[in-house]
Amino acid sequence: MNPSKRREKAKNRKESGRFAQLPHVVLNSPDYVGLSYKSKALLVDLVHQYNGKNNGDLTAALGTLKARGWKRSATLTNAVKELMKAHLIIRTREGKFQNPHSRCALYAMTWRKIDECEDKDLEIRPTATAPRKFSLEKQSKHPLLKA
């Protein structure tokens, strides 16, 4: 019996498929809470691209995100800048626009380790741990974080 069927039988439930994971420690951080709605929406769309092994290969290119409702590259650029300033994402590859070798910038979520992304020419090496460790940060001053 395959693992999916075993789980369904053991837990009496079906597999739910892929999901986008945003940990509470990130959602409750002052950096996230202080974001504009557009930056929060972009973060969700970047997390949506994550498949468990491609952190570092997430794109904010308009061509990719048009299907998710984005209309202006300037809006995306501003949201990316805000997410980077808040240290919620980092750029793993600089975009360049030279014919015929154009390529988009790539990003990684800071609360997950950066993965090996073959053939992506990342400028940041894969990591064993997340670049940012939210659980170790002092966050007691923020009202949403008090127990």
Could you tell me what each predicted segment is?
Residues 49-108, 112-113:
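Winged helix-turn-helix DNA-binding recognition segment
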Residues 39-46:
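Short alpha-helical "packing" element that flanks the helix-turn-helix/winged-helix DNA-binding module
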Residues 1-36, 121-135, 146:
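Positively charged, structured surface patches that bind polyanionic biopolymers
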Residues 12-13, 20-23, 36-39, 67-69, ...:
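A short linear-motif detector with a strong N-terminal bias
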Residues 141-147:
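Intrinsically disordered, low-complexity terminal/linker regions enriched in Pro/Ser/Gly
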Residues 10-14, 26-29, 45, 59-60, ...:
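A generic short-segment signal for beta-strand/edge and adjacent turn/coil regions
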